[in-house]
Amino acid sequence: MVIANSVKTSTPKFIISDISLSDFGRKEIKIAETEMPGLMALRDKYQSEKPLKGAKIAGSLHMTIQTAVLIETLVDLGAEVKWASCNIFSTQDHAAAAIADQGISVFAKKGETLDEYWQYTHYILDWGSDFPNMILDDGGDATGLLILGSKAEKDLSVLDNPSNEEEIALFNSIKSKLKNDGEFYSRIKSNIIGVTEETTTGVARLYQLQKQNALPFPAINVNDSVTKSKFDNLYGCRESLVDSIKRATDVMIAGKTALVMGFGDVGKGSAQSLRGLGAIVKVAEIDPICALQAAMEGYSVVRLEDVVEDIDIFVTATGNYQVITHENLVKMKDEAIVCNIGHFDNEIDVASLKNYQWENIKPQVDHITLPSGNKIILLAEGRLVNLGCATGHPSFVMSNSFTNQVLAQIELFNKSEQYAKEVYVLPKHLDEMVARLHLDKIGAKLTKLTKEQADYISVSVEGPYKSEFYRY
């Protein structure tokens, strides 16, 4: 591990695994840039204007090669950045090294402890005598830390009853910070202009806060941009799920019976990926609309408890809690593969397995012996499998998502007075712009409306072409 100290603050300049990996990281970043036309177009468009000059961004998002391209785009557009990963297993160490080598503050390494994770999240918020004024979040941990910490400043008892290992580490990190600075969280929170949120789970947290009138600053829901959710969540998972399962286990997927739990965009992509390699795919759903969609796609829609003993590969994709319980786990067949592609690690009741015999096969692959004598293969300890056991989504699809992130950061930072403490989405014309920026790369050519055709369907020749309520 490499720690470099900053001259301005007690917070280190960066913490990474190995700075010698920076050349390797830089080579992969250069390749990724050729696959990320949206971000590169924004660099060209805004290079001289620097619309993020003065922005001080605290970023909490998987520290991958693709994220490195995002970070350097933000910096090119004028921002100062401090970055941490939003998952203990998702960092690509060579990507972190390449960013650190550019003098950018990054606190990320693959295989962090929970204590390190929350320490690093604190580091991106601690700018010494200065303050961050923007948050770029994935899962809502940076935003949530500020809110919970602010509550603890007034009433420390909110930290009295942690319910799991993650909360123990989180609560301890807040208590430690408050011992040295009793107003840290409220001071930082008061300087935040807004947050842009990347993923479904984090967006759900923001809407909960809005419903409670507890959102401390404006937020842009990047996840529900069409060019994010219908591309990253669907097409990204369609490629990265099977990539991670194959890298982790080397099993033949064809002929296996797989259960995908959740048939939202992530579940749809996951089911397609498994079917594409010849798996017999079943789907579990709570939503009758999604269940009907799954049935119309030819998947058997089942209940977990009815099929648990017959499934070879379990994939959770719900964003919910305790989707696979201890009762389900102990009934699984020998050598069943269990993994999660939702954001957090609580979809599978991993904690209930801690008293059984674990055999680590390789990083993020564990053999667990059940009371029945059967063994299951747990991937990434129930955390995001595609980033724990592989390298996440391909660069091209992440360019869609991250182009939305940059546009959202520019919008909030420059027009903060136009936004109340609510959750917003980017307007349709920006969604369409993001899509346009990616068409040339794949050789797609748009048909152009005539003026008469545009008038006939009551749209502009240049778009937007769909209503805000259109479901793609």
From Swiss-Prot:
It is an enzyme of class 3 (hydrolase). It is found in: Cytoplasm. Disulfide bonds: none annotated. GO terms for molecular function: adenosylhomocysteinase activity. GO terms for cellular component: cytosol. Keywords: Cytoplasm, Hydrolase, NAD, One-carbon metabolism. Its EC number is 3.13.2.1. It catalyses: S-adenosyl-L-homocysteine + H2O = L-homocysteine + adenosine. It comes from the Bacteria. InterPro entries: Adenosylhomocyst_ase-like_sf, Adenosylhomocysteinase-like, Ado_hCys_hydrolase_NAD-bd, NAD(P)-bd_dom_sf, S-Ado-L-homoCys_hydrolase_CS. Substrate binds at residues 64, 138, 198, 228, 232. GO terms for biological process: L-homocysteine biosynthetic process; one-carbon metabolic process; S-adenosylmethionine cycle. NAD(+) binds at residues 199-201, 233, 262-267, 285, 320, 341-343, 386. Pathway: Amino-acid biosynthesis; L-homocysteine biosynthesis; L-homocysteine from S-adenosyl-L-homocysteine: step 1/1. Its cofactor is NAD(+). Its main location: cytoplasm. Binds 1 NAD(+) per subunit. The keyword Hydrolase applies. May play a key role in the regulation of the intracellular concentration of adenosylhomocysteine. Belongs to the adenosylhomocysteinase family. This is Adenosylhomocysteinase. The lineage of its organism: Bacteria, Bacillati, Cyanobacteriota, Cyanophyceae, Synechococcales. The gene is ahcY.
